């Protein structure tokens, strides 16, 4: 894997499990990492920063539901750290709703899910793209989900938002080329607290239904993000599935 010395990586959703794992791998390869999260409580952020190799890493406050905050933080990061080479959109939100329970998927929940999981991704790209065009070989990585093409997952709105994210990845890869690459990553079940109520019992059932007989870990996703950033440098407009084969049997 290529080194990332001299590169600046921004991770939206930097205090989430996948964001943290990705930050650690980027830092281990020499990048300086800017982690963006809606809350930067030192009790939460300082241990994360302390776990990163190297120096120059920082936490910033912004919300993907507040475009002005994203514009401000993009300018602040460039001012503090210089040109931005890597943007990872890993912020997300969901809530379990059975696919056949139409009444439980309220208008308010649908709006919240699309606001975070689709509009928030676009708003981040819109805010950071002007600052990335000044960098060498910049790349945007959108964290999606196999729910986008299996129709399964925590709820229908989440699956639809992720399908929209995959389309966004393709469309912006064309629109922003050749200056920027835009790629995606589609995990399946990952051993995190992202989906409320899905604990060890759920993971065990999911593992038994996965060809590789385990659920993913945050590091599995982070390693794929690193690969898309480094060794897969000729890829753009594509979304890489990293799910242990789960989509084959869903």
Identify the function of each model-found stretch.
Residues 177-181, 235-237:
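Short, small/polar-rich loop/turn modules that mediate ligand/substrate recognition or access, typified
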Residues 214-242, 247-248:
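C-terminal substrate-recognition "lid" of short-chain dehydrogenase/reductases
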